[in-house]
Amino acid sequence: MRLWKSMAWGILLWHSQSGALCPAWPPARAAEEIARLQQQLADWNDIYWKQGVSAVDDSVYDQLSARLVQWQRCVGQDVSSTPVSPPLNGTTMHPVAHTGVRKLADRQAVEQWMRGRSELWVQPKVDGVAVTLVYQNGKLTRAISRGNGLQGEDWTPKIRLIPSIPQTTQGALANAVLQGEIFLQREGHIQQRMGGMNARSKVAGMLMRQDNASALNSLGIFIWAWPDGPANMPERLSQLAKAGFSLTKKYSLVVKDASEVERARQSWLTSALPFVTDGVVIRMAKEPASQYWRPGQGDWLAAWKYPPVAQVAQVSAIQFSVGKSGKITVVASLVPVILDDKRVQRVNIGSVKRWEAWDIAPGDQILVSLAGQGIPRLDEVVWRSRERSKPVPPDSHFNSLTCFYASATCQEQFISRLVWLGSRSALGLDGMGEASWRALHQTHRFEHIFSWLTLTSAQIANTPGFAKGKSEQIWRQFNLARRQSFTRWIMAMDIPLTQAALQASGDRSWEQLLMRTEQHWRQLPATGERRAGRVIDWRNNPQIKTLSRWLAAQHIPGFGS
């Protein structure tokens, strides 16, 4: 498939501001796009926290929230109103504020953050819903949703129905405030293979609904903070375990450097765990007194999240490719994203009909993942731009019998045919990829797919972009091609048969091939009636007949009299 580059449409220009990619929108459009995305996130947020229903995947919501912040910064807009927290319906004050956790982008950032800090531990970043548990006189008296970090919903009645959460405590925990994550209990969850499963939304839904007491049996608790607890981390973990919060001790490791953090992160990513995770949290054993905790100011802990299995990517252009068979395929060019250490900047959408059904235009946000063998795959459209400027696809008159000869409308299928004939399935012209064929055709204006046979060594050497060594190699390859078998030349002409079928036919000349009947072709391996008819159509095509005579004049084996 070759790109129909002349049909590319609506490319969005981008510039860098403070390290972020910014769309080059006029101010009015920027304001409109930001307002629309902000409203959509607010609507999803409201549904999520009021109804316990997720209208969009957790990862998609997080990435679009980050995209909104990026756009706001690009235009110098205040980002404080970004709807990343639940609507503030709850009025129950937290005894100790939830600080949140700073996100670190990569290992280098982890190394920098760890520098100068001591007594560090790493824990899995459990994916669920944050909560405050308040124990007084040995009894659970309050449970409060995270809310905005300072106050939240009173979840006490629901939390008391979760069997895995201790209702009574003793000793130092008899009067204590704990912060943790309510999670969906899993058996043998391998994050790398099973993904996030929208666990956060499922937990929120269970806690919001009024008619699902039995579902709460599937929830667990991971305590990640005991404000004003024992200063000694092993003692803190031991007391939590004795009180029934055993997971914290089991999944807390001492770390001295970023390498140890990375090993733990990779281990938890690939090992069977009892919960869904989305990264790791590194924390100092020594914490400030709880009276100093404030939302967004927890500098004694940081998170290193796993890369998402799917990335939200901005469509920068829509392009069309025409293959040697005439099939038109739509390709979306993307503002590059990283998936599994691979830089992804384009994704195949499929046919024109499929593209129209997806309704994708430049400026849209799409979810992209990697399919088998690391091939980018379109999963869904998660956000559509207000402006819907779409390109017009090329005419659909192309087929398997068009564009053996060059013309303005045949440019891309013609190039596809050149790439095919140079492949190992045909003439095996080593070193001849799409770029080389384009350079030769643009310079020497081929009449048809075999015009390169008439090029001299001097002409090849004078082709822009061809170094001396490369031009000599191509000259040798072109000369060697003259000695290729008749079967390979027929394959280069795109006969609609497999090489195995051609070998079984036993034809060694064009004259023999012309004498074959449709019945003969039907009997060949993997052929049948339909393909046999296509062979007859191919053989009788005027362009194919003309090419066969031209090859005969060039003394190509099998085409002479």
UniProtKB/Swiss-Prot annotation:
Its EC number is 6.5.1.2. InterPro entries: DNA_ligase_AS (IPR018239), DNA_ligase_B (IPR020923), DNA_ligase_CS (IPR033136), DNAligase_adenylation (IPR013839), DNAligase_N (IPR013840), NA-bd_OB-fold (IPR012340), NAD_dep_DNA_ligaseB (IPR050326), NAD_DNA_ligase_OB (IPR004150). GO terms for biological process: DNA repair; DNA replication. One of its GO terms (molecular function) is DNA ligase (NAD+) activity. The active site is at 125 (n6-amp-lysine intermediate). SMART domains: LIGANc. Keywords: DNA damage, DNA repair, DNA replication, Ligase, NAD. It is an enzyme of class 6 (ligase). It catalyses: NAD(+) + (deoxyribonucleotide)n-3'-hydroxyl + 5'-phospho-(deoxyribonucleotide)m = (deoxyribonucleotide)n+m + AMP + beta-nicotinamide D-nucleotide. Catalyzes the formation of phosphodiester linkages between 5'-phosphoryl and 3'-hydroxyl groups in double-stranded DNA using NAD as a coenzyme and as the energy source for the reaction. This is DNA ligase B. It comes from Salmonella agona (strain SL483). The lineage of its organism: Bacteria, Pseudomonadati, Pseudomonadota, Gammaproteobacteria, Enterobacterales.
